[in-house]
């Protein structure tokens, strides 16, 4: 099984990591902007477009909580995807 990797989004003003499955960006984990200090400061998003029209995500108190939630969502999403879904994303990238 292909391992998930993360790469820092250098264009983001806040800490943000793009998550990759092979060469396909399947989501992100990053600090939220414009939220009060007492609110969850992190967010995660799992899914990609085109190819996968099912995007899930949510807030998290810490990076580790966001990562755990992302990984759980990915484990549910991955079995529903085909190689054609990943190829659709590659085609729009290239």
Describe the predicted segments one by one.
Residues 1-41, 67, 83, 94:
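Short N-terminal "domain-start" leader segments
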Residues 19, 44-46, 76, 91:
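Intrinsic disorder/low-complexity segments enriched in polar/charged and small flexible residues
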Residues 31-56, 79:
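Short aromatic-glycine-(Arg/Gly/Cys) micro-motifs in beta-strand/loop hairpins
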Residues 34, 61, 87-89:
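Long, contiguous binding/interaction regions
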Residues 48-65, 73:
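A short, exposed loop/beta-hairpin motif centered on an aromatic-Gly-Thr core
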Residues 71-85:
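Short arginine-rich
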